[in-house]
């Protein structure tokens, strides 16, 4: 018992020393001890005063990519929607399975409004990702990877009475990964890097809707 207490004390002292040496304030240290690391409120929650984590809320995610993007990345619209859906689900947001949405889209090629999807699946919100650009290569290079994309992420809230929807949230999203230097194709396969970037991009989009920790922000520079 005494040995265990001593180990705990030593670990606490080491953590405290690291914080002091790295410039942490005593207030921050105390906050960590009491409630854990500080979290960031989702931008969607701040702007709309609503939350996708509320009880009985269900969300559909759909992505649109123009022909010029799908020429190089054939299924990027479905892939990104799938990754974002999984991120939301992992953060306790109820979602429509992405394969069901893909099936509906395949059967309704002429759809043009997010509310059509919302009405069919009887959800409260539709997250609509309008992908304007997407690449996995460093500019001017064919053997260096760097994911880049530009998109508009909007949320459509379904009317409780009829099938209409209102756009209640919209944000431009510009993404780049890694931030500091590209990755050589000799170090990672194309498939591996693509998965890494889609994971990163989907988390950047997901953080608009779920809480995350400031420590995650610091450690995600790439």
Protein language model features and the residues they cover:
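Bacterial N-terminal signal peptides that target proteins for export
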Residues: 1-12
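Stable alpha-helical elements in mature extracytoplasmic
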Residues: 76, 80, 84, 110-114, ...
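Bacterial N-terminal signal peptides
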Residues: 12-22
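Short beta-strand->alpha-helix linker/helix-N-cap micro-motif
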Residues: 89-108
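Short secondary-structure boundary motifs at beta->alpha junctions and helix caps
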Residues: 157-218
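Second-shell loop/turn segments in exported
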Residues: 65-75, 102-104, 139-140, 186-195
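Surface-exposed short loop/turn segments
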Residues: 108-166, 180
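A structural "domain/chain start" motif
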Residues: 24-94, 210-222
